[in-house]
């Protein structure tokens, strides 16, 4: 997808219900896409109530701010309440609603599909003894992994992950298959 003149734009939407309730009470994921970084942000939500959506949006927006990503425009689905609109005005200069029936204009739909496909692959690859109620704890690692596979739109020679977090140090955070059983050796007497 070639993006032209959408600097500092954010798209967001929520996924459908996850089949398992997580140990933290989460059932949904809010996915946000930042056009400059080409980065997909994922934040778990307990339900699709206004309070949970605002909490997830605020968490994602704070992460964008910490990374130095500007957001001047927020494009979202055509369902939005006055409370949600007011919270956005504090953070973003303008917002735009995708017209009903024009979901192909919401890049977040494509980001959701990419994240869902990747996360299904992650879940399919976990060990058979992995407790599925821990699925939301895999989100951070899945987000990191998916963004290590994408290039930034602003600086195509670096990864989307590096655009947001800086270069990944594989010695500090090695990547192993998610949800795999591990054995830890503990020396006696320590």
Where are the predicted features?
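Retroviral integrase
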Residues: 1-117, 163-190
